[in-house]
Swiss-Prot record:
Pathway: Phospholipid metabolism; phosphatidylethanolamine biosynthesis; phosphatidylethanolamine from ethanolamine: step 2/3. Its main location: cytoplasm. Gene3D superfamilies: HUPs. This is Ethanolamine-phosphate cytidylyltransferase. Keywords: Cytoplasm, Lipid biosynthesis, Lipid metabolism, Nucleotidyltransferase, Nucleus, Phospholipid biosynthesis, Phospholipid metabolism, Transferase. Ethanolamine-phosphate cytidylyltransferase which catalyzes the second step of phosphatidylethanolamine biosynthesis. Involved in the maintenance of plasma membrane and required for proper sporulation. It is an enzyme of class 2 (transferase). Present with 4700 molecules/cell in log phase SD medium.
Length: 323
């Protein structure tokens, strides 16, 4: 049977556990391999059972990982229960000629390269893996209770990184604005005319940015204020109480399709002079009746890791990370 592959369709797959800005960066780069106007990116996400068999217990369950990936600005469609070893027949089903992956090796339970077959078929494209961020690294910080201090050179994002993650759904055009502390200090200009009076604002530290947070952002953007732009203020807190750096939190939030602007190091006065609705993440008005927001919190995620502490310590040790 002849399969008609579409050059404007591309495939990426993965566990997308603790869907962080490294995953988002790979998704963004994959979207850029197809046309700005008509490109479509299919994100295949593995089941809990497949991950358990090939890699070990995921922290986030299938439903959480599917929906988090679906909330990514550059993901056109999530393909649930995609096989752990990339199958060209699945790519054919969605008319994708190529699969995109980072410049690292992913192996299955037998120690085989998950992309061996598609590489041999010439249907594999490589993008640059994001340095210094991984699910393994985040789990390591939870286990050791150690985070990077604000004085670390990689604690804050560069302007180049902010510009890269601020692009629109087509992965090229400008979209998100980025501010420092308040709206007077613009770091990145967005792709629309900004008016603070035409926005809704929510703040929080957005540590371990997860579907509980995203549920609330979706509610603000789609239900409570569908005619407003959504500004997210990412607050500074005692660094020892946050697991992720400001860079990791900001870039993760920028990748969310419900977000139109971000304020880095926001504080209580950042938006006080503006006549717009203001919220705080995690409050009842935002969490009520949310599929994920009613139960999923940073604290619950930490408990999941701690409840299987020995399992994750052993898994991380295999990757060269000792407690």
């Amino acid at each position: 049977m002849t399969v008609n592959l579409d050059p404007d369709k591309v495939w990426i797959d993965g566990c997308f556990d603790f869907t962080h800005h490294g995953h988002a960066g790979a998704i963004l780069q994959a979207r850029r391999t197809v046309s700005k106007e008509n490109g479509k990116l299919f994100c295949g996400v593995h089941t809990d059972e497949d991950i358990q068999h090939n890699k070990g217990t995921p922290v986030m369950n299938s439903s959480e990982r599917y929906e988090h990936t679906r909330s990514n600005r550059w993901c056109s469609e999530v393909v649930e229960a995609a096989p752990y070893v990339t199958d060209p027949n699945w790519m054919d089903k969605y008319q994708c000629q190529y699969v995109v992956h980072g410049d690292d090796i992913t192996i299955d339970a037998n120690g085989e390269d998950c992309y061996k077959l598609v590489k041999e078929m010439g249907r594999f494209k490589v993008v640059k893996r994001t340095y210094g961020v991984s699910t393994t690294e985040i789990i390591h910080r939870i286990l050791t209770k150690k985070s990077l201090p604000p004085t670390h050179p990689d604690y804050y994002p560069t302007t180049q990184e902010l510009s890269f993650y601020s692009v629109a759904q087509d992965a090229v055009s400008k979209h998100c604005y980025v501010f420092q502390r308040d709206l007077d200090n613009v770091l990145v200009n967005g792709g629309y005319k900004f008016d603070a009076e035409d926005c809704v604002y929510v703040d929080g530290d957005f540590d371990l940015f997860h579907m509980g947070d995203i549920d609330q952002l979706r509610k603000l953007k789609m239900d409570l204020h569908p005619d407003k732009k959504l500004i997210v203020g990412i607050t500074t807190s005692d660094y020892s109480s946050t697991i992720m750096t400001m860079k990791e939190r900001v870039l993760s939030v920028l990748s969310c399709k419900y977000v139109d602007a971000v304020i880095i190091d926001a504080d209580a006065t950042s938006m006080s002079q503006y006549n717009c609705e203001k919220y705080h993440i995690g409050t009842a008005v935002l969490t009520a009746a949310g599929k994920f927001s009613e139960y999923l919190t940073k604290e619950l995620i930490v408990k999941r890791v701690e409840s299987q502490r020995e399992v994750y310590i052993a898994r991380n040790q295999k990757k060269g990370m000792s407690i």
